[in-house]
Amino acid sequence: MKRFMKAWSKYLQIEEKISHFLKVKSITILEYAVALIYIWYGLLKLFGVSPVQELVIESTNWILPEGFVVVLGLWEILIGVFLCIKSLRRYGIWLFIPQVLGTFLPLITNPEDCFVKFPFVLTLEGHYIFKNLILVAAVLVIASTLYKRKAS
């Protein structure tokens, strides 16, 4: 039992060090992770190899021009680049808002592409869309860091 308690104590010390490290670095890691996702997805659209390209075209062809996917790709790359640069981060967040709202558009315009059985059984495309809720939460965390809290 004594051995276990010693090992447990050592584990807790390591866990505490990791927790302190994450307290300092986790938002930076989150910023770069979201930026990487946006740059990657944007490049896929830019080069015409995005797995959701057809869904984007189908859900926007009634309102946006044919080359919109390329513009969207550039838009997403800008979001990613701006999130990497602290002085431009707020612009990345502002660009993110209409982009992420647009990602939910197929739920309205093409529900048959998003659901096997409405409202709970999703297609692969539906999964792809709903995972954007995680990106929304991540960007909310990033946005919360734009201003330092003043001591009161």
Could you describe each region identified by the protein language model?
Residues M1-S152:
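Membrane-interface extramembranous regions
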